[in-house]
Amino acid sequence: MSHASPYENNPLLANLTLGQKTDYIAEYSPQLLQPVPRQLNRDALNLAGNLPFHGEDLWTLYEISWLNNKGKPVVAIGEARIDAGSINLIESKSFKLYLNSFNQTRFADLATVRHTLEQDLSKCAEGAIKVALYPLSEAAHHIGTFPGECIDDLDIVIDEYHFSSDWLEQAGDNHTIVEETLHSHLLKSNCLVTGQPDWGSVVIHYKGPRINREKMLRYLISFRQHNEFHEQCVERIFVDLQRHCQPEKLTVYARYTRRGGLDINPFRSNWETAPANMRLIRQ
């Protein structure tokens, strides 16, 4: 069963720079950041009051550069952890444009840049933000792998590519309680505004009734023509798994390929803390 889109003709999305021709500003401009209320998606998921999960959106910033006090360029790799309890998520194109505005701006040192990022991002998200910046000599993002078993090699026939949570109906086996970790690299959704493809991998760690792997894979593949932001997709997966399969403990963590020098990696759980950053092979 498909769900009605809460986004169609929504005025909260009308003024986003995403999907529009924009000028690239090279002088520090925090006003370029644009928020999107998280509640826009959560209302459609019937999430009000206390959330059934905690977590964060872990962004990796690959293209950040500024000038030191002598005018010499500095480059770094950054991480921004945006609490899932913040009022807003940050729209990714506006984040890219904001980072570009550092390019011709002088900063005293790396700590000043980090503080500036935290201050601006916290204001936009209206929530807690933690930022780390690393000189390239100290950045150690080794290519890793997701834990658990990959379900992508299941030999199944797929002829439906429209999103539906119905694939998860009766997917939980209440007679068999397990703790297991499953992952898939077949997650694909599309940008909510532009329709451009978003490629991701997702890992699901749960304790509860054993989830039918074929049904889970069909469900994940059904995102293939679904238009939603990364963060919203992960929260939808969490809520659908919890609603249909009723695990006692659940973690959903996705890592998406980068666009515009940024990758977004949403983490949601009711029992675990967010992991250290890493890179998958496609990142």
From Swiss-Prot:
GO function term, MF aspect, one: preQ1 synthase activity
EC number: 1.7.1.13
Oxidoreductase keyword on record: yes
Enzyme class: oxidoreductase
Record-linked Gene3D superfamilies: 3.30.1130.10
Assigned keywords, A-Z: Cytoplasm, NADP, Oxidoreductase, Queuosine biosynthesis
Pathway participation: tRNA modification; tRNA-queuosine biosynthesis
Chief localisation class: cytoplasm
Pfam family of the protein (one): QueF_N
Residue pairs linked by disulfide bridges in the UniProt entry: none
Active site, renumbered: C191 (thioimide intermediate), D198 (proton donor)
UniProt-annotated binding residues for NADPH: S92, K93, R259, G260
UniProt subcellular location: Cytoplasm
Reactions catalysed: 7-aminomethyl-7-carbaguanine + 2 NADP(+) = 7-cyano-7-deazaguanine + 2 NADPH + 3 H(+)
Organism domain of life: Bacteria
Alphabetical list of PANTHER family matching this protein: NADPH-DEPENDENT 7-CYANO-7-DEAZAGUANINE REDUCTASE (PTHR34354:SF1)
Quaternary structure and interacting proteins, as annotated: Homodimer.
Function according to Swiss-Prot or TrEMBL: Catalyzes the NADPH-dependent reduction of 7-cyano-7-deazaguanine (preQ0) to 7-aminomethyl-7-deazaguanine (preQ1).
Name the record gives this protein: NADPH-dependent 7-cyano-7-deazaguanine reductase
Species name: Tolumonas auensis (strain DSM 9187 / NBRC 110442 / TA 4)
Gene, per the UniProt record: queF
